[in-house]
Amino acid sequence: MLWELYVFVFAASVFLNFVGIIANLFIIVIIIKTWVNSRRIASPDRILFSLAITRFLTLGLFLLNSVYIATNTGRSVYFSTFFLLCWKFLDANSLWLVTILNSLYCVKITNFQHPVFLLLKRTISMKTTSLLLACLLISALTTLLYYMLSQISRFPEHIIGRNDTSFDLSDGILTLVASLVLNSLLQFMLNVTFASLLIHSLRRHIQKMQRNRTSFWNPQTEAHMGAMRLMICFLVLYIPYSIATLLYLPSYMRKNLRAQAICMIITAAYPPGHSVLLIITHHKLKAKAKKIFCFYK
């Protein structure tokens, strides 16, 4: 029974990978065509383009790993380490890109008057390139910390130096673990905060429209509703994903196949699910997707 559950989850994960690869490839192609035609690219589309490329590479890497698992092909320890480090880097980069995208949506749509919020509103659009580079640097640093932690944990707890001095490695391990946890916690807090602020602001705007009989439903309001639905669905996918990612790491979870299967399906559902949501709520991507579906009907 447990083996059948694992096979089902594995097959579902591969299917979700295919969906995510197609969705992100669609985003990449449409944004490139728009970029070539208009000779310019907006800040949200630039971030979305970077996110789609990162997720395309991440899901492609997972698909390659699934092929290795399904065919029982032997691979060296170095290949496994390289695969894991690539996944850590791409996953961290995609999460930071999502954080920037959520912050951009939040400052563009909401109208809070807090000084910090106003500062973000003035600078975030102009600093898009710098923020994208910062995502790469932070992701590389996080991956390096993870690699250092994995290497240190292989050694004994105490190492004797040349002068017979005993070095306790627990302090170094705790420092690295704290750095990784703080990085994930910062991402989680920022994403939940930006999404919650946007949902709260849009809900107040819609309630105000309902009280004002003279207001009418316009394309801008429709875009705001799309952003609100996007953030609600994002939280539904992102919060379980963050919890499952943390629970998937401890060794006792690896021994529990049921818990491992649940974490695997949750982590596999988030990237393609969020990519599809981005297509549905983006007016250009949604229009192109409708044309493609109507053509093949």
Swiss-Prot record:
Tissue: Expressed in subsets of taste receptor cells of the tongue and palate epithelium and exclusively in gustducin-positive cells. Expressed in 15% taste bud cells in circumvallate and foliate papillae but only in 2% in fungiform papillae.
Keyword annotations: Cell membrane, Cell projection, Cilium, G-protein coupled receptor, Glycoprotein, Membrane, Receptor, Sensory transduction, Taste, Transducer, Transmembrane, Transmembrane helix
A Pfam short name: TAS2R
Record CDD domains: 7tm_TAS2R4
GO biological process per UniProt: detection of chemical stimulus involved in sensory perception of bitter taste; respiratory gaseous exchange by respiratory system
Primary localization: membrane
Keyword Transmembrane in record: yes
Membrane topology: Multi-pass membrane protein
Superkingdom in the source lineage: Eukaryota
Glycosylation: residue positions: 163
GO CC terms, sorted: ciliary membrane
Cytoplasmic side: 33-46, 102-128, 193-229, 282-297
Residue numbers on the Extracellular membrane side: 1-11, 68-80, 150-171, 251-260
Recorded GO MF terms: bitter taste receptor activity; G protein-coupled receptor activity; taste receptor activity
Keyword Aminoacyl-tRNA synthetase appears in the UniProt entry: no
Cellular localization per UniProt: Membrane; Cell projection, Cilium membrane
TM helices/strands, residue ranges: 12-32, 47-67, 81-101, 129-149, 172-192, 230-250, 261-281
Record's miscellaneous remark: Several bitter taste receptors are expressed in a single taste receptor cell.
Role according to the record: Gustducin-coupled receptor for denatonium and N(6)-propyl-2-thiouracil implicated in the perception of bitter compounds in the oral cavity and the gastrointestinal tract. Signals through PLCB2 and the calcium-regulated cation channel TRPM5. In airway epithelial cells, binding of denatonium increases the intracellular calcium ion concentration and stimulates ciliary beat frequency.
Family: Belongs to the G-protein coupled receptor T2R family.
Protein name per Swiss-Prot or TrEMBL: Taste receptor type 2 member 4
Protein's organism: Mus musculus
